Every structure is written in C-alpha cells, then in structure tokens.
C-alpha cells in the first residue's frame, strides 16, 4: 500500500538481515502503481534467483523469497546473475509460507504450476497481485495448490517437456501481467541510431 501512495520520486534504502550479514537494498519508490509481487517458494538454484531479481529490477516487481533456500542469498552466483541491478530490487525473505501470509495482505494471487488446468493468459492480473512459483525440482507443494485451486495457472508447453526454467517462467508471466496492465511506469519505446 505504501508504494501506491508515493507521488514524488525518491530513493529508499533498507538494511535487511540475511544470515550473518546485512543485505543493503536500495530501490526507487517513485512508482505510483502497487507493483507486482514475485513469490519464490523454496528456490534451489542461485542463478535462477539472480535472473529473476534482474527481471524484478527491469519491471519494478518486488521479490519475496520463502525459506528454506537452496543457496545463500549472498552467494556469488546469485549476485553475478543479477549483475549490477541489485540496488533496484526490493527483496524480502520469510521463514516459511505461514510467515509470508502473516506479513502480507494478499488480495489477488496466481500459482504457476504444470498441474494447473488453465493457461496463464486466461488469468486477469491486477495491480499488486502476487505470483507464486515453486522450487525447480518439485514446483509448489500439492497442499498449497489444493488450497488455492481456483488461482492455479500454467504456461502451455509440449506434453513431452517436464517444465520450463524457473526464471523463464517468471519472466513470461510477469510480462503477461504487465501487458494486461498496459506496462505501467515502463518505457515501451526505444530510439534506434541512424
């Protein structure tokens, strides 16, 4: 809600305790939209997390990490994959899903799963919605999917393929949500030389 009320541009810096260290997060609070929320439930591969952080930086999405993680957030592979975009990403971590729901008021959520009956393009994404993605090897927990059955969507693919890469799935879904919202606060034009 705080981000939706910001009308003038300023930078905000927070210190976030991660394990034994402090991760300094600096992000631009100039956006007037609530922003999308990417929720990674027990991600295992640091490079995926870094790539997803870069997608968040480019789109203004907030990144939520649900523990246990398969890596240390300060891992070099995470930082390398996110390049020099970390200062543009708001990252919040949680002990578990219960901790996440206790700390967030989720008005709309979509759970991405290969088991879902309908396509992610059939969903109507609202500003501030939460997009849940499971761990690379197992996806979201079955009981979680059962509890949120009406919010489950999938990315279509060939039947012989098990799944898409996690960071690719996040990017595909985030950009569909942003397309439906008319790419708020994003530059959708460029200038070619010559």
Describe the residue ranges of each PLM region.
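Post-transcriptional modification and biogenesis factors for structured RNAs
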Residues: 8-19, 23-194
């Amino acid at each position: 809600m705080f981000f939706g009320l910001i009308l003038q541009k300023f930078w905000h810096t927070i210190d976030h305790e991660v394990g034994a260290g402090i991760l300094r997060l600096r992000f631009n609070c100039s956006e007037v939209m609530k922003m999308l929320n990417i929720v990674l439930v027990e991600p295992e591969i640091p490079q995926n997390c870094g790539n997803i952080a870069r997608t968040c930086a480019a789109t203004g999405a907030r990144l939520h990490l649900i523990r246990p993680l398969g890596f240390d957030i300060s891992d070099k592979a995470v930082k390398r994959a996110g390049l020099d975009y970390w200062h543009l990403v708001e990252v919040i971590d949680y002990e578990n899903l219960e901790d996440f729901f206790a700390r967030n008021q989720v008005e709309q959520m979509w759970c991405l799963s290969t088991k879902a009956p309908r396509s992610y393009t059939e969903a109507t994404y609202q500003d501030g919605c939460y997009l849940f993605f499971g761990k690379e090897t197992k996806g979201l927990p079955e009981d979680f999917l059962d509890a949120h059955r009406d919010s489950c969507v999938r990315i279509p693919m060939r039947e012989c393929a098990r799944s898409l890469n996690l960071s690719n799935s996040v990017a595909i879904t985030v950009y569909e949500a942003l397309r439906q919202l008319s790419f708020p606060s994003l530059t959708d034009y460029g200038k070619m030389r010559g």
